[in-house]
Amino acid sequence: MTTDTIVAQATAPGRGGVGIIRVSGKLASDVAHTLLGHLPKPRYADFCDFKAADGSVIDQGIALFFKGPNSFTGEDVLELQGHGGQVVMDMLIRAVLKVKGVRIARPGEFSEQAFMNDKLDLTQAEAIADLIDATSEQAAKSALHSLQGEFSTQVHTLVDKITNLRLYVEAAIDFPDEEVDFLSDGKIAAALYAIIDQLDEVQASAKQGSIIREGMKVVIAGRPNAGKSSLLNALAGKESAIVTDIAGTTRDVLREHIHLDGMPLHIIDTAGLRDTTDEVERIGIERAWSEIASADRVLFMVDGTDTAAVDPHEIWPDFIDRLPKAMGVTVVRNKADLTGEPLEATEEQGYSVYRISAKTGLGVDALKQHLKSLMGYQSNLEGGFIARRRHLEALEQASEHLQLGKVQLEVYLAGELLAEELRMAQQALSEITGEFTSDDLLGKIFSSFCIGK
């Protein structure tokens, strides 16, 4: 951990009513004496002049001093809140750097110091960047929940339960004559199943939090001339794709990035799926299947004039059978303006079914609301936390180890192997909060932050 004293502008560069310079480290008090002529009373606002080394006044404003460990970074912190002109900010930073031993902060270094000094765990530190980068009110609220420790608390609860179970199993190993009875009495199995169920719930919430942060990938798929490109245009609100009556017009993947009430949505229009001898169209169809395989949701576009069926297994069983097992599918019956069917949403055989006219826009707003709900949009903004892809990967690793541990318990009654799988699951979860994390990962995370944060 560095013992350097660091300085950076904490507010965004450019013109503004207020600009803030932040200093953190053991030399923060020396900086105060140099620029202010005194050390402000800790945690009290002090209106004073900010002076250069020659005594000339650079600016005047509010000085705040926080004595470590009672500060954001856990170190002594000085904040100078002056006028927001960039020239003034640069002059103040140069004056601070004249104090020997002070250097410019790296991106995210203030948050990194807070993490190193146990003021924040890693998910809370990441939540600061996510709160700053939030593109919707929902994302901001979820990031704030993570900053307040909601995600961390759930992870810590799981780690504690896994640790206690592991100790219980290891106690059984220490008494080999009783180990088999100990492992087969049902108590360990019940505790393990409860942990697996709880982890499943956290995984579901984390996946929703990841969608709120990164957006949901929605692929529009179906047979040629079902109206896929028309739906892309309707959702995007512009003519992104060429629309004709000729089957196979779309031969490549088309992408649009839109926001629904600020929530990011990545829409992919694909080539119509069919057998073809046209080489270019065939390549487009292969790309379509590749996009479908990595989608968060598939909009199965159906030409309502071709069939009255609503069950996708009845409409096109081969298509549904080829989809990844856990893929979410929404059936979109298009051309309701021609079929005259009511513009209603129904649930059929576990699938959401929407009736629309991509050409006229009828029913498209209801489909947008459906997509918003899938992304976790909540009008009351209650609950939920933000999550990153690395969090999902760590949760999946923990889940895999718990499932392997379940096999060791149920099939082999192997206490040592169960204990090892529990240890690996515990380690995977601890990577989320930073209790077990490599320096390379820390560097990658904090380097993506703003300077001054």
Curated annotation (Swiss-Prot):
Cofactor: binding comment: Binds 1 potassium ion per subunit.
Residues involved in (6S)-5-formyl-5,6,7,8-tetrahydrofolate binding: R22, E79, K119, K453
Compartment(s) where it occurs, according to its Swiss-Prot or TrEMBL record: Cytoplasm
Residues that bind K(+): N225, T244, I246, T249
Keyword GTP-binding on entry: yes
Binding-site residues for GTP, renumbered to this chain: 225-230, 244-250, 269-272, 334-337
Residues where Mg(2+) binds: S229, T250
Gene Ontology process terms (BP): tRNA methylation; tRNA wobble uridine modification
GO CC annotations, alphabetized: cytosol
Entry EC number(s): 3.6.-.-
All residue ranges annotated as the TrmE-type G domain in the record: 215-376
Pfam family, one: MnmE_helical
GO MF: GTP binding; GTPase activity; metal ion binding
Co-factor requirement: K(+)
Sorted UniProt keywords: Cytoplasm, GTP-binding, Hydrolase, Magnesium, Metal-binding, Nucleotide-binding, Potassium, tRNA processing
Enzyme class: hydrolase
Chief location category: cytoplasm
Subunit composition and interactions: Homodimer. Heterotetramer of two MnmE and two MnmG subunits.
Role this protein plays: Exhibits a very high intrinsic GTPase hydrolysis rate. Involved in the addition of a carboxymethylaminomethyl (cmnm) group at the wobble position (U34) of certain tRNAs, forming tRNA-cmnm(5)s(2)U34.
Family: Belongs to the TRAFAC class TrmE-Era-EngA-EngB-Septin-like GTPase superfamily. TrmE GTPase family.
The protein, known as: tRNA modification GTPase MnmE
Organism of origin: Shewanella amazonensis (strain ATCC BAA-1098 / SB2B)
Gene symbol of the encoding locus: mnmE
